Amino acid sequence: MAPPSRHCLLLISTLGVFALNCFTKGQKNSTLIFTRENTIRNCSCSADIRDCDYSLANLMCNCKTVLPLAVERTSYNGHLTIWFTDTSALGHLLNFTLVQDLKLSLCSTNTLPTEYLAICGLKRLRINMEAKHPFPEQSLLIHSGGDSDSREKPMWLHKGWQPCMYISFLDMALFNRDSALKSYSIENVTSIANNFPDFSYFRTFPMPSNKSYVVTFIY
């Protein structure tokens, strides 16, 4: 059999590059954020990265360093993974931020305080605490409402703030326990600041009292 001509090889090579580009464009990148030494690394990853493997993340993902005070409140419609060693930056990253699919991975053996995060629109939560407990990754479905659900329609709290009709309160002390992830929800909650006076961040993020909320506690 005669070897393929140079023209055929060039055509095959071109088709291969085209197919690779189409495959890459078809992939949806996920966001990975990790905190180290008072800095935050915000990464866009085309593939899953092994939890807490900082070197691999820097190698395989497109990452940039962000100073904590420069972090802007945003929303995440896709997958968001956060690696953390303590809770110092989590409130700034997550409180009243719209996150639909969240994974939190503890990358240290630190004992975490009883501190609540308030997350908007959370549909699925995954947690990994293997650095502290030999416990498999856990997953919890919060709610599965679609865009057609009237409660999902955006309600803007303030310029630059995120729509927040579903609110999940996440107790960070759950990472200290080797027990199953649990939650319960309360529907049709009005005057949310009055019903939960111990949550001081409602003074920073005032919630309209004429709206109805679905509140979920995760512990």
Curated annotation (Swiss-Prot):
Q: What keywords are annotated for this sequence in UniProt?
A: Glycoprotein, Secreted, Signal
The record's annotation in InterPro entries points to: ECPIP (IPR029250)
Sorted alphabetically, which Pfam families does this protein's record hold?
ECPIP
Q: In which tissues is it expressed?
A: Detected in the kidney and in the endothelium of large blood vessels (at protein level).
Biological process according to GO: mitocytosis
Q: Where in the cell is it found?
A: Vesicle; Secreted, Extracellular exosome
Q: Which GO terms describe its cellular component?
A: extracellular exosome; migrasome
Concerning PTM, the database record says: N-glycosylated.
Key word Lipid metabolism present: no
Q: What does UniProt give as the signal peptide span?
A: 1-19
This protein's record includes keyword Transmembrane helix: no
A GO MF term: identical protein binding
What are the glycosylated positions? N29, N42, N95, N188, N210
State the family named in the UniProt similarity comment for this chain: Belongs to the EPCIP family.
Give the protein's function: Likely to be involved with PKD1 in the detection, sequestration and exocytosis of senescent mitochondria.
Outline the subunit composition: Homooligomer. Interacts with PKD1 (via the PKD repeats in the N-terminal extracellular region); the interaction is not dependent on N-glycosylation of either protein.
The protein's name: Exosomal polycystin-1-interacting protein
According to its UniProt entry, this protein's organism is Homo sapiens (Human)
